[in-house]
């Protein structure tokens, strides 16, 4: 952590880290309950951590693959930044929610929100699956697509389209004030009042 960024340190505070020696990978797998990786299917196979190999070492293992677009389909080998995932998942089109200007291009939300939200949900899924695996002895491969997750949490965008066939737009009408982009002398500034 000494040579890492403040962002990395904040995300990993209180965690123990280790360096994996590929010669001892099998020992580590046999000790683990959950293996988490972010590799595409081909890369996972090249590194020897694809689900088939891991289950041959420990059938009750939970393998969580958090990838940009999932492990199947035409984008399975694609990598993506948070910017790409926000756009591919549809979130960028709703941002900023404070603007009703249709000419404003899609924008990225601050930080790595897509990856952070998806990671929290993926961790919950992995823990629930590990609990089940401990009871049944059956391991499971979890194919977690960040893009699919982002698309699933677009406020009411998905149900609105599903039931009304209406495409969601930026929702600039807010009851809490201020929640708006204000034009200051040196440029726009966004002010949000999320507490009453």
Where are these regions (language model features)?
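Alpha-helical interface/anchor segments and their boundary "cap" residues
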Residues: 161-196
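Short linear motifs in exposed loops
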Residues: 21, 96, 143-145, 192-193
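N-terminal helix-loop segment corresponding to the beta1-alpha1 unit
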Residues: 1-135, 162-166
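Glycine-rich beta-alpha junction loops
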Residues: 68-70, 146-152, 186, 194-196
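Short, acidic/polar N-cap/turn motifs at the starts of alpha helices
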Residues: 7-8, 139-141, 178-181
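Short acidic/polar mixed-charge low-complexity motifs
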Residues: 16, 138, 187-189
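Substrate-binding/catalytic subdomain of NAD(P)-dependent oxidoreductase enzymes
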Residues: 129-169
């Amino acid at each position: 952590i000494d040579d890492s960024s403040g962002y990395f340190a904040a995300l990993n505070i209180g965690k123990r880290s280790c360096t994996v020696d590929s010669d001892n990978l099998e020992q580590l797998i046999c000790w683990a309950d959950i293996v988490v990786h972010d590799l595409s299917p081909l890369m996972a196979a090249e590194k020897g951590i694809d689900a088939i190999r891991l289950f041959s070492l420990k059938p009750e293992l939970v393998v969580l693959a958090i990838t940009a677009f999932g492990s199947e389909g035409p984008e399975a080998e694609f990598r993506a930044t948070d910017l790409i995932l926000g756009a591919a998942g549809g979130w960028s089109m709703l941002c900023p929610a404070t603007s009703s200007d249709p000419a404003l291009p899609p924008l990225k939300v601050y930080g790595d929100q897509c990856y952070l939200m998806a990671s929290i949900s993926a961790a919950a899924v992995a823990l629930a699956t590990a609990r089940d695996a401990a009871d049944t002895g059956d391991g499971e491969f979890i194919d977690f697509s960040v893009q699919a997750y982002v698309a699933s949490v677009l406020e009411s965008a998905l149900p609105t389209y599903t039931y009304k066939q209406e495409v969601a737009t930026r929702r600039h009408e807010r009851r809490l004030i201020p929640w708006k982009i204000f034009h200051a002398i040196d440029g726009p500034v966004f002010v949000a009042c999320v507490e009453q």
